[in-house]
Amino acid sequence: MKESIKLKLDLLKDRYEEVGALLSDPDIISVQEKFKELSKEYAELEPVVQCYQEYQNALNAIEESKLLLNDSDADMREMAKEELAAAEESSEQLEKDLQILLLPRDPRDGSNVFLEIRAGTGGDEAAIFAGDLFRMYSRYAELKKWKVEIVSESPGEHGGYKEVISRVAGDNVFNLLKFESGAHRVQRVPETESQGRIHTSACTVAILPEVEEVGDVDINPADLRVDTYRASGAGGQHVNKTDSAIRITHLPSGIVVECQDERSQHKNRAKAMSLLKAKLLSSAQEKQAKEQAQTRKSLVGSGDRSERIRTYNYPQGRITDHRINLTLYKLEEVVQGDLDPVIQPLLQEYQAEMLASISE
């Protein structure tokens, strides 16, 4: 291990112990905001420090085994040889784990997100597929104990959605969903197809991190046009009786957001503003990324919603992620919400790219 990395790990270990002591200080406990801030830092440091401790234990085991290689007892020497091999293998893996843990963390990884799904080519079948995708992400969210709220929806004529926007809240949401942005393609025989022909349809998915601080995005109220209208869809007696739904247009960019989920106009406006901030921030970051000269394009992809990233082939029970040439024959499990076998390889590829760029 490089001396600079070891020095950094020693500093992180010292800070971990310092924060641990502060968290038991009654003066800190009484200040809720400070206690929350330190608790978050402690939780972020813990996996790094624990891994570093295991790495140090493995190094100690290597030294002890080497000493026993010269023992007069043949059985003891053989045992030391086996233990040395195991400790060396363990230390190599732990060093790799530490390198990944020390990679710069995207500050947005812990953010909640807005999940946008829009039906593309394919008419009714595309809208039905949009509904399938929304159900897939909702079930994945359920497995992760995340909360999903629909912000706005436009139902398809024969099921599914022409468009559905939802807010997904919980731990590590953006980190796990950030590579879902792009065009998702489905190949299957529609229920309405009498000849049994396979149709191809597509939907676009966009993952927008929620903006936590108002200061992150500067919006001039004069740049906004706010319209109210009557909500449509489920809602019992209140439907079409009050203008509770909100449509906000950001005039300089032309971005339009809507929210009709809540019965309160005030709540709908707050949700719509939150979505608008996320869209404006995402737009600015996309522009910045395009302007930056990149020596190579990321295999994981740019997050451009027009980029075809994945195909769901029902006749073959196959799902293929085109960015990393990943093919799995477990389509049914994935669309039922078991997304980790797709998401984890994408994260690993991203980490490998970052490690390669750091070592270049």
Swiss-Prot record:
GO MF annotations in UniProt: translation release factor activity, codon specific
Localization: Cytoplasm
Residue numbers spanned by region Disordered: 286-307
SUPFAM superfamilies linked to this entry: Release factor (SSF75620)
Transmembrane region(s): none
Positions of post-translational N5-methylglutamine modification: 237
Modification comment: Methylated by PrmC. Methylation increases the termination efficiency of RF1.
Record-linked Pfam families: PCRF (PF03462), RF-1 (PF00472)
Gene3D superfamilies given in the database record: 3.30.160.20, 3.30.70.1660, 6.10.140.1950
Keyword Cytoplasm: yes
Lineage: superkingdom: Bacteria
InterPro entries named in the record: PCRF, Pep_chain_release_fac_I, Pep_chain_release_fac_I_sf, Prokaryotic/Mito_RF, RF-1
GO cellular component, as recorded: cytoplasm
Keywords associated with the record: Cytoplasm, Methylation, Protein biosynthesis
HAMAP family assigned to the protein according to its UniProt record, in alphabetical order: Rel_fac_1 (MF_00093)
Biological role: Peptide chain release factor 1 directs the termination of translation in response to the peptide chain termination codons UAG and UAA.
Annotated family: Belongs to the prokaryotic/mitochondrial release factor family.
Protein name: Peptide chain release factor 1
